[in-house]
Amino acid sequence: MENDQFLQKQHFLILGLAKSGYAAASILHEKGIYVAVNDQKPFEENEPAQKLSEKGIEVVCGEHPVSLFDQHQITILIKNPGIPYENIMVQEAEKRGIPVWTEIELAYYLTSAKFIGITGSNGKTTTTTLIYEMLKADSQKALIAGNIGTVASEVAYHADGDEWIVTELSSFQLMGTHAFRPEISLILNVFDAHLDYHHTRENYEKAKQKVYLHQTASDKAIVNQDDETVVRLAEAGKAEIVPFSVSKTLEQGAYVKDSMIMFNGEAILPLEEVVLPGAHNLENILAAIAVVKTAGASNEAVKKVLTSFTGVKHRLQYVTTVNGRKFYNDSKATNILATSKALSAFDKPVILLAGGLDRGNGFDDLKPYMKHVKAVLTFGQTAPKLEKLGNELGIQHVKRVDNVEQAVSAAFALSNEGDVILLSPACASWDQFKTFEERGDMFIDAVHMLK
């Protein structure tokens, strides 16, 4: 009630009309709250802007006029997470002392439902999905939202107070939170990522830390004891810490002992019964268990999911086998750590398809994981760097192609029966695609064309 009264007094400006901006504007308008919209794309080419205009919302397209702040007496700016803080409208808001939100903050204000906030440099989507499936298997009321594809404000707006909103959170989204308080929060891991956006490692860490910062002593922070950065970031919060560890035997929390997955000293199931592929997924599994056991889930619910859940699309997803060659779609691998984990999952010869947006980093950190790689097909802005890497390692076949489709056919031509053909780009997709999903779907389509 208090949150709703706060919202009713505000004048909002929505900056950027992707899914989250459109949803935020629509919800605020429906609630009778003052809202205006600004988007770079020209109005005549902008279907979401046209739809909002038809609802009676003021929409300004094609430019970013700072006069909108005075014209509409704006008190809060909600920006698309991907819009950089260097944007003129964001800079103007900060100059005026106007709070800059992402729609995650709005989602928090729209509901009395309980949030589970999941962030990390890698593994977010798999872990978020595991948590959601485990809560459902336990017959708890759960919704899934955030960076996983479902707009959080939309989910929150329609949520009941007794539901869990299992929310995948990017650093971009968390930067625009100021009061957002999950009852259960999780940072899976932290390493250098998105430094083109955050500029420094410190800024990136501060964004991730926001998932812990506003929690109270009655909340729970799920903490990866194997990641020194996560342990340090959790210390700034007030929540009770629930640990998990892949490498240590713990007195409480989630861990592995004698090939058995444990929680608080109680055996849940043998590791060999888990069907999710890839050693790297153990971190995601233990984190998910720590979350759902904290939320009161039964061991039976956890077991039911772990003995049936085989993974998420675009995350080391098995596609098919063609003439003895196994194809895997790991398009979600938008950084080096994700690709190194994918490569670690195979002990058979691998043909690696990689490349994408150039964020200025090198790829030397991949070298220790390339021992099974027999060929590299590169594409996108980073193709020259990955080509250089392959040549330095003395990989027999290193070839630059124009796109994912060409990479698939070239990889198949170079392959033998028993080989793994792996799309794991180690780069974001935005140089050639709108999303990593689009890139993964193109890979899947190209693979099926081989049959």
Swiss-Prot record:
Gene3D superfamilies: Mur ligase, C-terminal domain, Mur-like, catalytic domain, NAD(P)-binding Rossmann-like Domain. Keywords: ATP-binding, Cell cycle, Cell division, Cell shape, Cell wall biogenesis/degradation, Cytoplasm, Ligase, Nucleotide-binding, Peptidoglycan synthesis. GO terms for biological process: cell division; cell wall organization; peptidoglycan biosynthetic process; regulation of cell shape. It catalyses: UDP-N-acetyl-alpha-D-muramoyl-L-alanine + D-glutamate + ATP = UDP-N-acetyl-alpha-D-muramoyl-L-alanyl-D-glutamate + ADP + phosphate + H(+). One of its GO terms (molecular function) is ATP binding. Pathway: Cell wall biogenesis; peptidoglycan biosynthesis. ATP binds at residues 120-126. It is found in: Cytoplasm. Signal peptide: none annotated. This is UDP-N-acetylmuramoylalanine--D-glutamate ligase. Pfam families: Mur_ligase_C, Mur_ligase_M, MurD-like_N.
